[in-house]
Amino acid sequence: MRLLLFATITVLGMSQALLAQGSDNHWEFGVRAGVVNYQGDLQRALFTAEGSRPAFGAILRYSYGNHFALRGSMELGNISADDADSDDLRARGFSFESSLFAGELTFEYVPFGKELYSNGIFNSQLNPYVFTGVGFAVADAEVSTVNPADAARFPEEDDQSAFITVPIGGGLRYSIASGISVGVEANWRPTFSDVLDGVSVNGNPDAMDWFWTFGGYVSFTFGADDDIMNLR
């Protein structure tokens, strides 16, 4: 929970500072698409092709200067895993599937950001960035079993459908034209829970579940004068 407390303090402090800044501020709206993957009791690996599912989302970004931004985002997708895909777990015979909705507020740092306009001339840039923040996820896992006798174990007593998350990630952002940027990013989220997949006491209750996304996006600037747009 120290990670959650640190992320909350960071986002609240930086959001107050950013919103108090002056006229250089601007907004961006973007859409993104990629894949979502899960790690937990039914999938120990960080990534598997079998567990990858499409994910889609939207981004609203408030930028100040060349190095900092506050971003709200949402994402929709599905997560799933099957013991049959793992040599170690195949004999157990569990599988799960769930829709997933995630929302978050993150602070973004662009270490090498520069102004894109020099004497009125646009200069494209490619910049790495990192981010962290606070968020939530909503998932309602449905567990299936190969052995009919195991079906009575689910849903588990501590089953839940809402989770607190701490998004941690980074990406690359390329400003391709005035007011337009594209990028790719990866985002890891611990859920501080072991029931994202609906399996805890019937699996490994000491290890929390994660999910992560990887994908690309395009964003468009608004709320800024043309000569002060500082896309990164």
Q: Language-model segments: which ranges?
A:
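Cleavable N-terminal export/targeting peptides
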Residues: 1-25, 223-232
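Predominantly the C-terminal beta-signal and adjacent terminal strand-loop region
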Residues: 100, 176-232
